[in-house]
Amino acid sequence: MPLLTTPYAELDLIRQPDQANDPLQAFDAADEYLLEQLHAQQLAAESRVLVLNDSFGALAASLVDHVSVVSSGDSHLAHMALEKNLARNGKAFDSVPFVPASEHWQGHFDRVLVRVPKTLALLEEQLIRLQGHLAPGAQVIAAAMIKHLPRAAGELLEKYIGPVQASLAQKKARLLTANFAQRPGASSPYPTRYRLDSPALELLNHANVFCRDGLDIGTRAFLPHLPRDLGNARVADLGCGNGVLAIANALTNPQAHYTLVDESYMAVQSAQENWQAALGDRAVTVLAGDGLAGVEKQSLDVVLCNPPFHQQQVVGDFLAWRMFQQAREALVVGGALYIVGNRHLGYHSKLARLFRGVEQVAATPKFVILKARK
């Protein structure tokens, strides 16, 4: 893999999650452009720089020896990547503080470097939260590959930060620089809420939660076919989002024990709040993690999963395949994985490579619900 070479450092970076023979690199031309632009400003060593949405730590790891840098974002995998890439390049793994998107920053920043996220609601929430954290003369510099840079990103910077200057294109990347100007205080439109009729629930969704404005059609197809009569089974909701699958299942399985896990900190925050609203003080484990990687082998009886098919702008079934492998490791012999998936993804044949038996529980014109038994 090529090294990231900038005026700040030469770094050997890897992506997360680890994939054998991964053809994708852990940085792009937008990272390079952003670092070149910042270096040209010759910031003092005591300058405070906040880095947002740094997918694999390329920005923060480049800056760690040159300014006081803090990284923040909504991805547990990005946090893991930052720590691994710092250590991989001879730095202390914890030398850059990381603030999850569900928590708040401390102090003021002279520069904020933003990788424009796929979900613009996350960008909007982050820009609103920056109010009160920008030092006089601060700049917010957003970077993206042009094909992933919507006009709305510049409009949000203008609305919440100040006048925006777009750069020339460089290697198909562009920067948007906003000079801090006092704006009237803005209240956040997040979290959003929506109601379900069956089961009767009101669900809260923080800014980066998938389908935050309404139930996604895959989950809608899945809900009527969730397993019943589970007794005191140990159940995991893998990639839980706002927690709707686990919560709906828990309502009909009062003795079962639930673990909800997602790599999005905002999803975990939403799931925790939704569980409490629906089920009060009933015991539950809700955590941000790399799927079931940290779960003890053969410790679960049931896994529920509506697997994702993209990681930021990268589309594919590699995350789903990894989740299926993790579920197999975590399930007891005889345990079952229940999933929903688009018909065209061919999950039945993939599951058959890992599990003893795979059956179709239900189907719609677009989705299949499958049960895979270990």
From Swiss-Prot:
Localization of this protein: Cytoplasm
Keywords: Cytoplasm, Methyltransferase, rRNA processing, S-adenosyl-L-methionine, Transferase
Its EC number(s): 2.1.1.174
Pfam families per record: MTS
Reactions accelerated catalytically: guanosine(1835) in 23S rRNA + S-adenosyl-L-methionine = N(2)-methylguanosine(1835) in 23S rRNA + S-adenosyl-L-homocysteine + H(+)
Main location (coarse class): cytoplasm
InterPro entries: DNA_methylase_N6_adenine_CS, rRNA_m2G-MeTrfase_RlmG, RsmC/RlmG, SAM-dependent_MTases_sf, Small_mtfrase_dom
Enzyme class: transferase
Source taxon at top rank: Bacteria
Cellular-component GO terms for this entry: cytoplasm
Gene3D superfamilies assigned to the protein according to its UniProt record, in alphabetical order: Vaccinia Virus protein VP39
GO molecular function ontology, one term from the record: nucleic acid binding
Similarity section: Belongs to the methyltransferase superfamily. RlmG family.
Functional summary from the UniProt entry: Specifically methylates the guanine in position 1835 (m2G1835) of 23S rRNA.
Name listed for the protein in its UniProt record: Ribosomal RNA large subunit methyltransferase G
